[in-house]
């Protein structure tokens, strides 16, 4: 008798995804982050659901409802902080996952990569609208500053901003719709993640060498289920350490002050995971130019498959490209640091140099280096 796991229409899908999936035998721990992102998403949806049961999306009660969750709801404090720090873990895994894709040439799977870029935008949108919900000072002013960027669009900008706000400023209508968006977007992310997997399983996973591995595949279970469980345990440990010992480490103290439209905080800045893009935005002394640079800093990822000039897929055997990859990582860390600093000398000039280097590396230096490496290999 054939195993039900292989015949039942639903079980068959699960089996082909998590059990009998042929997987390259040499993929490293950098391939763990896909499953960790799935774990993060499920954690965020569950904690978010329980938070939504007690939260009120109204300007007069939003801040106090979050306080109520932390003080009066059974284990509300841990649910709230798991959700807030879970977002940080989500972005750590997301950036590691993208870095892996860049390093090993996984972007050659065009459809999978493009869905991934759309997923990144969706996750960023979800995190942004979610940050507005506690209705603290940084929530309010962050929403005001970022939505205001759309007013840089010629002709329709101002109308567009007021349409998004639902009025002439960030107010009750804005908070209500942001809550609605924050509730629906994770489910859209879930659907997109499934499409992401469908496209990945059309081609099979890449591996560190970038060489086709069809002749050397092993079943996903038990080899990679066990390997993924180790990664999951490390992720859970890190999240719990952060939540239980330093829950406010990555947050902004300003967000413990209720939103006040009459008092602007000294330094308006987003959460750490948006600082690199914020630094690029601020490095251009023109509103429309800054907004375009901000958009391009992420949209540029969609161009990466077209910018691949090397005859090898992975960077495993390309030392010069490896060097530039780590320069890019250092550059992004520099931008993240600059994004959190006030707009004054020397931070402004460092941010401008780092922004130029970011685009230069991706658009010019890395493709050119790949061509040089091709020549060195006598190809």
From Swiss-Prot:
Residues that bind a ubiquinone: 201
Main localization of the protein described in the UniProt heading: mitochondrion
Binding site for heme b b562: 83, 182
A cellular-component GO term for this protein: mitochondrial inner membrane
Listed GO MF terms: metal ion binding; ubiquinol-cytochrome-c reductase activity
GO BP: mitochondrial electron transport, ubiquinol to cytochrome c
Protein origin, superkingdom: Eukaryota
Binding residues annotated for heme b b566, in chain numbering: 97, 196
Transmembrane segments: 33-53, 77-98, 113-133, 178-198, 226-246, 288-308, 320-340, 347-367
UniProt-annotated location(s): Mitochondrion inner membrane
Cofactor: heme b
InterPro entries for the chain: Cyt_b/b6_C, Cyt_b/b6_C_sf, Cyt_b/b6_N, Cytb/b6-like_sf, Cytochrome_b, Cytochrome_b_C_euk/bac, Cytochrome_b_N_euk/bac, Di-haem_cyt_TM
Misc. comment: Heme 1 (or BL or b562) is low-potential and absorbs at about 562 nm, and heme 2 (or BH or b566) is high-potential and absorbs at about 566 nm.
Subunit note: The cytochrome bc1 complex contains 11 subunits: 3 respiratory subunits (MT-CYB, CYC1 and UQCRFS1), 2 core proteins (UQCRC1 and UQCRC2) and 6 low-molecular weight proteins (UQCRH/QCR6, UQCRB/QCR7, UQCRQ/QCR8, UQCR10/QCR9, UQCR11/QCR10 and a cleavage product of UQCRFS1). This cytochrome bc1 complex then forms a dimer.
Protein name: Cytochrome b
Organism: Balaenoptera borealis
